[in-house]
């Protein structure tokens, strides 16, 4: 898949180069498939009115630390420029009207596709999380509570669940900060075990955009920052989505 992404990127870059200089997107506001403004871009990803279920809302399984920190970040959305990202069951729902670049799109007759981190439907048993994004600073904070279905060592979360959650937070941040679409690499250094049903805070930042790649970093820690669970870095391929053809 990664090789295929590079092949498509190279082909798109070649055709674009015949018409204009290659365009790297170092800021959030250039013209793109989303339109000519940041507002247009976010209106696609963050619809004001939708009948889709937002899974990034509090439920009875959330621990007290998760609930209180969620409320703190909600307050920041009112005054500090933070945005609470909705979380639908499929990424298809986040990019309605758009599609993957030519050569990457696949057809499927599956009607109930789900993103991996929303595949466990029982509240509190799988991935409980919410992501807040700061567009000016190009960073995110993810509040993650691993449930008992994500257990690895008895009583502790499987390392793969944290890796999946880091990748998901990286991908949403990369997409909104610079049209990052695909994970090219993900490196994780685990530091401490995470108790099941406890809060993990993940601080994600975009470090740079270079050669059509977005370089990201993440620190996963406890709320009081006294325990670091893991540190990671990721690289994402920058590609623009395309408008879907009218049916």
Swiss-Prot record:
This is Acyl-coenzyme A thioesterase THEM5. The active site is at residue 167. It comes from Homo sapiens. GO terms for biological process: cardiolipin acyl-chain remodeling; fatty acid metabolic process; long-chain fatty-acyl-CoA metabolic process. The keyword Mitochondrion applies. GO terms for cellular component: mitochondrial matrix; mitochondrion. It is found in: Mitochondrion matrix. Gene3D superfamilies: Hotdog Thioesterase. It catalyses: hexadecanoyl-CoA + H2O = hexadecanoate + CoA + H(+); (9Z,12Z)-octadecadienoyl-CoA + H2O = (9Z,12Z)-octadecadienoate + CoA + H(+); tetradecanoyl-CoA + H2O = tetradecanoate + CoA + H(+); (9Z)-octadecenoyl-CoA + H2O = (9Z)-octadecenoate + CoA + H(+). It is an enzyme of class 3 (hydrolase). Keywords: Fatty acid metabolism, Hydrolase, Lipid metabolism, Mitochondrion. InterPro entries: HotDog_dom_sf, Thioestr_dom. Pfam families: 4HBT (PF03061). Has acyl-CoA thioesterase activity towards long-chain (C16 and C18) fatty acyl-CoA substrates, with a preference for linoleoyl-CoA and other unsaturated long-chain fatty acid-CoA esters. Plays an important role in mitochondrial fatty acid metabolism, and in remodeling of the mitochondrial lipid cardiolipin. Required for normal mitochondrial function. It comes from the Eukaryota. Its EC number is 3.1.2.2. Belongs to the THEM4/THEM5 thioesterase family. Changing residue 167 to A: Abolishes enzyme activity. The lineage of its organism: Eukaryota, Metazoa, Chordata, Craniata, Vertebrata. One of its GO terms (molecular function) is long-chain fatty acyl-CoA hydrolase activity. Its main location: mitochondrion. The keyword Lipid metabolism applies. Changing residue 160 to A: Strongly reduces enzyme activity. Abolishes enzyme activity. Homodimer.
């Amino acid at each position: 898949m990664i090789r295929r992404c590079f092949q498509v990127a190279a082909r798109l870059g070649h055709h674009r180069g015949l018409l204009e200089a290659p365009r790297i997107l170092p800021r959030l506001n250039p013209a793109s498939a989303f339109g000519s403004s940041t507002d247009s871009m976010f209106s696609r990803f963050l619809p004001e009115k939708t009948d889709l279920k937002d899974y990034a809302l509090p439920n009875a399984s959330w621990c007290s630390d998760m609930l209180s920190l969620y409320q703190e970040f909600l307050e920041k959305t009112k005054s500090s420029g933070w945005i609470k990202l909705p979380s639908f069951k499929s990424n298809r729902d986040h990019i309605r009207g758009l599609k993957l670049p030519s050569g990457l799109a696949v057809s499927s007759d599956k009607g109930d596709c789900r993103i991996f981190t929303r595949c466990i439907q029982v509240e509190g048993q799988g991935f409980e999380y919410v992501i807040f994004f700061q567009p000016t600073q190009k960073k995110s904070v993810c509040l993650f509570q691993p449930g008992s279905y994500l257990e690895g060592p008895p009583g502790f979360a499987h390392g793969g669940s944290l890796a999946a959650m880091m990748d998901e937070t990286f991908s949403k941040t990369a997409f909104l900060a610079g049209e990052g679409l695909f994970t090219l690499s993900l490196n994780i250094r685990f530091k401490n075990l995470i108790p099941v049903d406890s809060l993990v805070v993940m601080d994600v930042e975009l470090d740079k955009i270079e050669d059509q790649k977005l370089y990201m970093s993440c620190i996963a820690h406890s709320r009081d920052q006294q325990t670091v669970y893991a540190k990671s870095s990721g690289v994402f391929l920058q590609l623009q989505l395309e408008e879907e053809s009218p049916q």
